[in-house]
Amino acid sequence: MIINEVIINEVIINGVINKYVINLDNCIERMNNFDDTFIRWRAIPREEVDEYTDKKLITYYNVSREYHLGCCACLLSHITLWKHIIDNKINNVLILEDDAVFNKEEFDEEVIFNFNNNGILYLGGFFHTIKMVQKKDKLIIPNSINGINFLDKNNTRILMTISYYIPNYKIAELMYNTIINLKRWRVLDSLMYHIPINNYYYYPAIFIENNQYESNIRKNKKKYPNKYYTFDRK
C-alpha cells in the first residue's frame, strides 16, 4: 500500500490540542459531557443533505432512507470540519463525535500531542477485516502494546469515526482531497481506509461509545466498541 509522505516541517505546531466535538442541534445536551476546552462543531442533520451528496454516496440496497441520509450527514459533518482545519491551518486536532466517552480518568494530552507522525491516530473504534463483507474468522486482531501502535492496513482496518487525531493541517488536506476526488462515496469510516496515509491507534482506546445514547444513524443499535477495539453488546 502506498503511503503518502507529508512534510511535517512545513507546519508550525501551535502548542495546544484543538479539541472538536461534532454535535447535532437536537442533541445539544450531550455537550454537557465535555468541558470548555472542547469546541462544538455543528453536525449537519439529514434534512440538510444536498442532492449531490445524496446521489454520490452509495449504501446497501436494503437500508432505510433514514439510514442512508444519516450516513450522508455524517460524512459531510466530518469533511466540512476538515475543510475548516485546512482553511485556518489548524494543527494538533482531536475530533470526537458527541457520543464519545472517556475510558481514562484523565486525558493524557502530552502523549497525544507528541504524536507527530505522517498519519491519523485513532483513539477509539473497532478492528475490522480488510473487506467490508468478510467472515469473522478472517479478522486479524493485531498484537498491541499500551500506547501508540502502528496499524498494518494490509491485514486490518479500524472502523468508526468516534475519535481520531490529526497532527497537522497538511494531513487534513490530504484526507479532504482524497475523499472529495473519489467518484463515488461510501460511509466515511470505510472511505478513510483508502486514504493513502499511515494509520495508528492508541491502546487501550481512550474513547469508547456511550451505549446510553441512541445512535443518530442506526436505530436499535446493539453493539458498541470497547477499549480493546472489539465489541460489547448492550
Predicted regions and their residues:
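An acidic/histidine-cluster motif and surrounding catalytic segment
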Residues: 2-6, 10-96, 100-234
